[in-house]
Amino acid sequence: MMDLHRLRLLREVHGRGTVHGAARALGYSPSAISQQLAVLEREAGTPLLERVGRNVRLTAAGQVLVRHATTLLDGVEAAEAELAAVAAGRVAGVVRIGAFQSAFIRVVAPAIRSLAEAHPDIRVEAAELEVEQAAPALRLQQLDVMVGDEYDGQPRAVHTDLLREHLLREHIRVVLPEDHPSAAADRVPIADLADLPWAACQPGTGHREMHVRVCRELGGFEPDLRYSSDDFLILLELVRTTGAGALLPDLVIGQGAPGVAVRLPAEGAVGRAVFLLTRRTRTPAVAAVADALTEAASRATPDW
């Protein structure tokens, strides 16, 4: 019978790409991990890893074993959590959440507050994180819940081994200086804003890609992207103080932003989906956190 500890080591090596990376993460020596994996290969009766330069990758047999090992290890984690909850008489455990900035403020923080009242024995640890980092961290059990985003026309990678649930959908709104001539209308044609300087996230981000695409496809122009920051609050301040424009989601704007005009594009709806990503097997504590995030998300977007 295969040892769960060795299966965990195999999954860690697969996730990190090197024996040395797994050793650093787990606090073992590389030789100790190599010895344990050699035993696992003997138990499996076939090679599980092959070297590619300085890295290692799974053989076909290794891929089969890691897939089943993930199911087994997630099941063990869930069983241990349920036993702890039964022993305590209530849901308990540590749940680690990752989220992008605006969801952290509008969804995660309110959910943590409600969990403190409803489930005081759940310890929530939360960090700002981009969704690209989430899937490996979820598989390696470094993260339990990820709140991610997906702009229209820019689909995220599909992870069939993880569970994705819809949380909310936001509008992307045009944010202008209050005294801009187009701010007088309820809806603003993007084409009328070709002469504006713009503030957007850094190159290579989903927001930047969305911004360029909207200006090109709806407005017919190449935007003058003069200001860059991955902090949406900085982008709002740049609109307020420099006369720039921005395209920002509802979660950033909240119930309103003083000193700026917030309008919908006249050409039609542009949006962003916000979703929850977890392992397929959820502990009672993770399920409680997911429920709290869903409830907080239902109240997070403005009624305008």
Where are these regions (language model features)?
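Short helix-boundary/capping micro-motifs
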Residues: 12-29
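A short LG(V/I)-centered, amphipathic sequence patch enriched
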Residues: 41-63
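Central regulatory/effector-binding core of bacterial HTH transcription factors
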Residues: 92-155
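A late-sequence structural motif
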Residues: 107, 261-304
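Hydrophobic hinge/microswitch elements
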Residues: 130-135, 139-143, 149, 204-261
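Secondary-structure junction motif
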Residues: 149, 182, 196-218, 283-291, ...
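Beta-alpha-beta core module
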Residues: 156-165, 170, 233-281
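Flexible hinge/capping segments at coil-to-helix
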Residues: 161-198, 284-287
